[in-house]
């Protein structure tokens, strides 16, 4: 299968480079931003197509690596061309293939959502990390082996997902990738109130955060959990809450700590967490 990319941003750069490096044929790129298309083509040793029609004609698989808000409008442009038998894919974590490509069955093309569970931050180096990344796929069941097989042959890990689960799946990804940034930003701010510079706060937190994540990934959340909630240390929890100046920070601390109490109960089924939960529930609303 020959793959073409419409849109030449970070995801298009990354996936195109990975596929070419792993023996897959990439026809090239088309973008309204001709400079980005040429840059991506040079990076992947492919070509920048002069027209959408050229890329469509030369490709069996089309990845629409454009912003989520543009996917459907770009697809509608594609649908005006002969696309019967082609795989039309987007990389949005939130949109299903049916939402992104309405009435695609009328064109004879096959629709897929192919989402890398990964934050692409550097378009020149992120492709090196893709072997460790899960790609979730949903779409046309009759031709699933084609798109999944191409990715698997290139050494990528794939997992099928039910379209009905797509939004919850995306929320889970956001919790791990985005919400944790907010939590760490709060921690850095609190250390700043204790006299740390931002640079020193990040340096101080690095071994704590990385060690905790390594433990969690190796042994699971139950075994990784430590701290005052796990010990049912009500005095320390009260002091923590008293030290937080804003109601929003106290609510955040309490809601997350209630989740920790659930984990702690699984770790210590015979331990009573009623007292600490009662304290946390006072501040959780």
Describe each model-derived feature in a short phrase:
Residues 1-58:
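NAD(P)+-binding Rossmann beta1-loop-alpha1 motif at the extreme N-terminus of oxidoreductases
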Residues 24-25, 109, 156, 196:
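Short phosphate-binding/catalytic loops that engage adenosine nucleotides
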Residues 27-31, 88-90, 135-138:
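Short, hydrophobic beta-strand segments that form beta-sheet elements in well-ordered domains
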Residues 39-43, 126-218, 280:
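Internal alpha-helical scaffold of NAD(P)-dependent oxidoreductase catalytic cores
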Residues 40, 270-285:
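Short, basic/aromatic-enriched C-terminal tail that caps enzymatic domains
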Residues 47-125:
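Rossmann-like NAD(P)(H) cofactor-binding subdomain of soluble oxidoreductases
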Residues 214-272:
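Interdomain hinge/lid region at the active-site interface
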């Amino acid at each position: 299968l020959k793959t073409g990319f419409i849109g030449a941003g970070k995801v298009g750069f990354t996936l195109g480079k990975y596929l070419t490096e792993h023996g897959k044929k990439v026809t090239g790129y088309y973008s309204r931003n001709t400079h980005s298309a040429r840059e991506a083509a040079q990076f992947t040793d492919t070509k920048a197509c002069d027209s959408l029609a050229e890329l469509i004609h030369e490709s069996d698989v089309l990845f629409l690596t454009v912003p989520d808000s543009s996917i459907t409008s770009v697809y509608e442009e594609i649908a005006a061309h002969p696309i019967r038998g082609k795989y039309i894919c987007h990389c949005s974590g939130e949109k299903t293939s049916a939402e992104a490509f309405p009435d695609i069955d009328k064109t004879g093309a096959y629709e897929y959502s192919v989402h890398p569970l990964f934050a692409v931050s550097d378009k020149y180096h992120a492709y090196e990390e893709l072997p460790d990344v899960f790609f979730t796929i949903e779409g046309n069941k009759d031709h699933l082996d084609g798109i999944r097989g191409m990715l698997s042959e290139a050494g990528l890990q794939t997992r099928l997902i039910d379209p009905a689960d797509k939004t919850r799946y995306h929320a889970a990804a956001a919790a791990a990738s985005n919400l944790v940034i907010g939590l760490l930003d709060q921690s850095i701010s609190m250390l700043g109130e204790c006299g740390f510079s931002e640079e020193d706060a990040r340096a101080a937190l690095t071994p704590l955060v990385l060690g905790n994540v390594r433990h969690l990934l190796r042994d699971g959340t139950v075994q990784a959990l430590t701290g005052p909630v796990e010990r049912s240390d009500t005095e320390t929890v009260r002091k923590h809450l008293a030290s937080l100046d804003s109601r929003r920070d106290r609510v955040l601390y309490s809601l997350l700590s209630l989740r920790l109490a659930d984990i702690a109960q699984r770790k210590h089924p015979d331990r009573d967490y009623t007292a600490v939960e009662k304290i946390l529930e006072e501040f959780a609303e």
